[in-house]
Amino acid sequence: TSQPDCSVGCDTSYCPDTSSCNCGTFADYCKCCQYCNACAGKTCNMIAGQSCEDGYLCRPPEGYSYIDVVTGRISSLCLRI
């Protein structure tokens, strides 16, 4: 997959509502929309590059690998850096 084409402009009408984000937000690749961070200890989408709240990183739980996440064996979690 290729990176999105950010030169086409930004239509914020397609952006999600982030008013109920409990753990902050992060900007998409083109810096157009904001998305909710996943909270500490909660599942996150490591494959899609979902961010976690400050001080945490979306990764496989201890004892598991990225392959375990990709194959659906386990979900990634927001774990302390």
Swiss-Prot record:
Entries under InterPro entries matching the protein: Growth_fac_rcpt_cys_sf (IPR009030)
Keywords in alphabetical order: Hemolymph clotting
GO biological process: hemolymph coagulation
Free-text tissue specificity from the UniProt record: Hemolymph; Hemocyte.
Top-level taxon in the UniProt lineage: Eukaryota
UniProt entry tagged with the keyword Kinase: no
Oligomeric form and interacting partners: Multimeric.
Entry protein name: 8.6 kDa transglutaminase substrate
Lineage per the UniProt record: Eukaryota, Metazoa, Ecdysozoa, Arthropoda, Chelicerata
